[in-house]
Amino acid sequence: MQLSVATISANDNDGDLLQYSLSGNDPSYFSITNQGVIAFNQPPSYFEKNEFSILINVTDNIVSITQPLTVFLLRVCSDSFLGKIVCFEEENTIIEYDRSNDYPTWQDWDGDCQSNRHEVLESEHIDDDSNHPLVFSSDGCFVNSGKWFDPYDNLYYFSSSEVQIDHVVALFEAHKSGAWSFPASRKLKFANNIDFDDLLIAVGGSSNASKGSSDPSDWMPNNSSYYCEYLNKWLNIKSEFRLSLDSDEREVILNLYQENNCQN
């Protein structure tokens, strides 16, 4: 197993011998050679600790330089399911879940005064109806009205107050499936990610409430013509973020795939 994580390059103009050392929060997990190669002392365990923060110190005994480094571990998945590389594992149903602290929504990542909720409302607005244009608040920070299609219930909505932003893989479902082990920064990104197209979708409040935190073994959209697209989104998210698929979930998804002639 390869334990090295990075190689630090430094030069001294006078040709003096450089000395490397580590400090910070987690130096005991690593070693660094005279050539600047940083490696784990022991094979790390993803579920025990997967974020490490260290300071790299370089000195010629006259001048010293310190550089921070954060090392993240990624979960390795090796199971194959319907063309996706995934993790087969049962849900962790005993791990504590605190949505408000671990997965706060909705952030304003680009500083334009629009939270990510309103970014999604803007991006998913259907601009084909002059009677229902996209209307913002006077300060431009909030979407008030427009036109949105809920593929779960096959319905249109025209007021943003009737529309909710659904995490296709609900936060509690993601948490039980492995997101519980994400570092805090990754939990925050997962809860607010508008860059991964499949993760968030604007739907009616009633369909979102009906779904709750269910996986496909307990809930599917009322609109059966959307089954295949929904399942593909689900699998894309589970694969991309290395979230596990439990046995009941896999069985139902496979049956639905076959019954509806889905293609990935």
Spans of features found by a protein language model:
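Acidic, turn/loop-rich segments in luminal/extracellular domains of secretory-pathway
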Residues: 1-75
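A short acidic/small-residue loop/turn micro-motif
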Residues: 45-48, 123-124, 164
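A generic structural motif
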Residues: 71, 120-122, 163
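N-terminal module-boundary/linker segments of secreted carbohydrate-active enzymes
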Residues: 76-114, 120-123, 247-251, 258-264
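Glycine/proline-rich, flexible active-site/cofactor-binding loop segments
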Residues: 93, 99-159
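Domain-level detector of nuclease and nuclease-like folds
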Residues: 148-264
